[in-house]
């Protein structure tokens, strides 16, 4: 699968989901297209994808009000170097825990990834400069609700609710039912609590936007709860990243993107850190 764009037409709002190629982990970045401006969330990992995403933003022909970083994983923030070059002066908002993480570890992450991937990744990590406050905001006349969670799938993560548009962006907290999930922190109990909370909140949500792969529906929350429950059990039974990845592939033979579980196992067991 090559990179592509899925656009959700929600009457007075459009949500454009840029999805990187399968080779590049199907990473998602979002543009909320409002009547007169854009709210842009996440920036990709690889420079070519960030450039292509910037082209999408530019092609919409509206000013960018703000960037938002959904969580502290580098596959969602390294591309901000390119976006900030293309759209100078736009503030980047994130939860306090996300800002702290990028500030403390961003430079080391860039060094490590650049040693492996060279010019495919950014030369520096851009630290968000604006604190994202949880709660409800009206942006361009549209009601947004930002909800923050710590120590679940990531150290710090926001969920974006569009209460009037039956849409929720949960990013890496959930994955599509046919994919392996990224399990990079051993905080399984709390992650599962968060997922159950989101499932209860979902109500009439029709569009669920995940961090990797095409938009889906709320069935992905239940599928991720099932996956996380098994992941917790496997993590308690095996020794090391290789055994963990092998066991998860055996338990979920029908799920694709096996390299995702192999890579996330390296992070889960701190073979790769940060």
Regions from the PLM with identified roles:
Residues 5-59, 158-172:
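Conserved beta-strand hairpin/beta-sheet module of binuclear metal-dependent hydrolase folds
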Residues 55-136, 236:
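Active-site HxH/HxHxD metal-binding segment of metal-dependent hydrolases
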Residues 2-17, 133-134, 140-144:
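Short Gly/Thr-rich strand-loop-strand
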Residues 201-205, 214-274:
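Accessory terminal helices/loops
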Residues 45-46, 150-226, 230:
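Metallo-beta-lactamase
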Residues 20-22, 126-128, 148-151:
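Short Gly/Pro-enriched turn/cap motifs at secondary-structure boundaries
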Residues 39-42, 66-70, 145-146:
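Short catalytic-loop micro-motif centered on adjacent basic/acidic residues
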